[in-house]
Amino acid sequence: MNTLFMHCRPGFEGEVCSEISDLAARLNVAGYAKAKAATACAEFVCTEEDGAERLMRGQRFAELIFPRQWARGIFIDLPETDRISVILAHMADFPLCGSLWLEMVDTNDGKELSNFCKKFEGHLRKALMAAGKLVEDAHKPRLLLTFKSGREVFMGLAESNNSAMWPMGIPRLKFPREAPSRSTLKLEEAWHHFIPRDQWDERLHGDMTGVDLGAAPGGWTWQLVNRGMLVTAIDNGPMAESLMDTGLVQHLMADGFTFKPKQPVDWMVCDIVEKPARNAAMLEEWIGDGHCREAVVNLKLPMKQRYAEVKRLLERIADGFKARGIRVEIGCKQLYHDREEVTCHLRRLDVKKPKSR
């Protein structure tokens, strides 16, 4: 099992290769990354048998930026019929697994395998359980089968607490009809990724206040309002009337880069289309100067050197806070609902909660 297989957004295979190569160098794992453009996946082939496992044990998956999912394992060829027997034969080299996910890459060809995987999963699950290779136990490794075609599959392992929350890293979120734009799903996904679900009632509740910079028409504002927050929406464009009718939104026509609240707020969110360095500087200012305790900000990516630019900005933010003696939690992820961008989350750890409204 010397191969680490990773899913990603189509077109970002190179960023995954750069990021995982950085990780391998940091952990002294020898090998090489490879990927084909627009295939929505990448591999890191280790020269040592335990290399892929060392990569996974040395890194929290949630802290990676561009991979959507990962697993360590092997590629196997499948016959046209009796695929299950071949998979069971290879399971001799795998431990007892606690769950099973069948996956496919996020391409048109991959999506065509969706129906096959749905039909095949039930039969495979029964066979694995009958063979004593699968039980229901979240503490045991997850068996991840990524089908490249009906004839080729990557058989992989990942720990359920150190891999994607959803198959292929694609969230199953339902678009709320009341929300004024589909961008609302981006903020909801960010919360799922950056905030443990059992902390939502503590960190996203109705006694809080928030600011949405570049708010119109209100996709992100809707998420804050849906949690019961009192929101100041900053945008020169119009907000959805349905949001204004809630009585929880104050709309100010102002520049999102110059506006500052008179009193600290709990949350600042921003999806303004601007150069990533400018949005990163604004994020650092809001958290560093105490204008908010938590923030979610999108960084639009350049055409080239995208991983290098994100890494540079994150290091600049971290170094800035360290120099000022400010304790923060920094996260960054290319979410499923992101396009040519990444989503950053910052949480200040050394300030008291603002007074309730």
Q: What residues fall within each predicted segment?
A:
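SAM-dependent transferase fold signal centered on methyltransferase-like domains
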Residues: 1-357
